[in-house]
Amino acid sequence: MIRQEKDIKDEIMYGEREIEAGSLICFPNPNINRDYEISIDFPEFTCKCPFSGYPDFATLKIKYQPNTKVIELKAIKLYLNSFREKKISHEEVTNKIIDDFVEVSDPKWMQLEADFNPRGNVHTIIRVCHGKRNNLELSL
């Protein structure tokens, strides 16, 4: 069977279905007796400006020290992609993301940095934190 271009345009794609059905899920921390830090970069975050409707692009940097749960990476990807068509301010989306991550995983400490691409010659970086960071001797 040959699919026509119109059929493809009207069809909900598998990625869209996964994003729509996705939810933040966690798994047990495999090293609960050790303090360690997880860093995740998400360089292709998008949402829409609630005032203009234009797309906003950002790099998200998530760092956290897990408590009893670790957030599953594919779930993070699908969750963050769900903002692609939402009209939401930089400040609101950054705070919503960390609130949702904290609610599902209850980390010891978490920081989210949202580095939005400049628009109109204005560059916005928003940082939000939760909890108290344990001092780790990390060097690479």
Curated annotation (Swiss-Prot):
Its main location: cytoplasm. It comes from the Bacteria. GO terms for cellular component: cytoplasm. The active site is at residues 49, 56. GO terms for molecular function: preQ1 synthase activity. Keywords: Cytoplasm, NADP, Oxidoreductase, Queuosine biosynthesis. Substrate binds at residues 71-73, 90-91. It is found in: Cytoplasm. Belongs to the GTP cyclohydrolase I family. QueF type 1 subfamily. This is NADPH-dependent 7-cyano-7-deazaguanine reductase. The gene is queF.
